[in-house]
Amino acid sequence: MNSLLFLALVGAAVAFPVDDDDKIVGGYTCRENSIPYQVSLNSGYHFCGGSLINDQWVVSAAHCYKTRIQVRLGEHNINVLEGNEQFVNSAKIIKHPNFNSRTLNNDIMLIKLASPVTLNARVATVALPSSCAPAGTQCLISGWGNTLSFGVNNPDLLQCLDAPLLPQADCEASYPGKITNNMICVGFLEGGKDSCQGDSGGPVVCNGQLQGIVSWGYGCALKDNPGVYTKVCNYVDWIQDTIAAN
């Protein structure tokens, strides 16, 4: 991967210098249906994650954009029909108007579902932030992305990772000149645990609120290169206004 360029991998958090390193590494298998807001974006295969924020809208990363998406909800094993899933096609897919595919600033996208989903114990919404979370807040990251830092192991079962929101100064020091005010770092400077390919667009939930969207990083789970996430608290007005207008 060109170290001078960001590469938005289809179905992946943007990661370099290693293409195959964007997944949840060092996490654990989530308890079945314990993450009812987690969705899988599918175009014949799982390519990104997302979060259900009301019965007809999903939020994901803009670098996951495709013209047609099937949203799969109530999933745990994405390769087996378990009987609890709901599959709904997209009606509208709206990238943030200021999304920059080179810098990945404003890496956020809304998907309107063709019909409302049925909310239940296995399909539920996650709250938008009421305020921005402070550094040190413990968060939960989830996804079906690769589980290896080197090599590929795409899991069938949803994976989880508990990780702290890092100080912005540490985030900026890890990626000099790359971090905007719309980005946060979540994870471990010592490496070993991170999101990776296939997790992109998925949730970072802190104290029951969606504070982050899996966006990009340098490799996966590498020392001094924590995962970078879209700072959702900066976009609550845009989300609400866009939903109201559509």
UniProtKB/Swiss-Prot annotation:
Gene name in the database record: Try5
Free-text tissue specificity from the UniProt record: Expressed in the heart, lung, brain, kidney, liver, epididymis, ovary and uterus. Expression in the testis is limited to round and elongating spermatids.
Pfam families: Trypsin
Organism: Mus musculus
UniProt-recorded name of the protein: Trypsin-5
Lineage: Eukaryota, Metazoa, Chordata, Craniata, Vertebrata
Residue span(s) of domain Peptidase S1: 24-244
Function according to Swiss-Prot or TrEMBL: Serine protease capable of autoactivation.
GO CC annotations on file: acrosomal vesicle
Reaction(s) the record says it catalyses: Preferential cleavage: Arg-|-Xaa, Lys-|-Xaa
Similarity comment text for this entry: Belongs to the peptidase S1 family.
Active-site feature positions: H63 (charge relay system), D107 (charge relay system), S200 (charge relay system)
Molecular function in Gene Ontology: serine-type endopeptidase activity
Site note Cleavage, residues: L81, R122, F150, K193
EC number per UniProt: 3.4.21.4
Disulphide-bonded residues: C48-C64, C139-C206, C171-C185, C196-C220
Enzyme class: hydrolase
Keywords: Autocatalytic cleavage, Cytoplasmic vesicle, Disulfide bond, Hydrolase, Protease, Serine protease, Signal, Zymogen
Database matches in PROSITE patterns: TRYPSIN_DOM, TRYPSIN_HIS, TRYPSIN_SER
Propeptide residues per the UniProt entry: 16-23
Post-translational modification: Proteolytically cleaved and activated by an autocatalytic mechanism. Cleavage by CTRC inhibits autoactivation.
Regulation of activity: Activated by autocatalytic cleavage. Cleavage by CTRC inhibits autoactivation.
Protein origin, superkingdom: Eukaryota
